[in-house]
């Protein structure tokens, strides 16, 4: 696994439903006002998985078990400064979404069907594609 990466995102799935949030609508942030998945930028010397899990805790108040990760992939050179980004998929137990305590980033959160997220015109396009990559590898 490369030691340099810019960040990680994670699709948190439960019975075909997906945890999402609407980003703040600020011109100073990437992808303002679009639907997003948990995750964000690397801090200190954390691994990509540690980054994704920490961001999920910070943004949604949910601690994910690393054993729930069912897929991971590095996307070379697609992050800040040309660094890699990582994308994870976690299949979580029923009831996990009931534990959400939404943090202070974003306007609101929502659980949607995977199909609805993939069809959203106002979702971050490369995250929709990464979720499609997972689905094509796990039909």
Tell me the role of every PLM-derived stretch:
Residues 26, 30-32, 37, 70, ...:
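Residue-level signal for pocket-adjacent positions within structured domains
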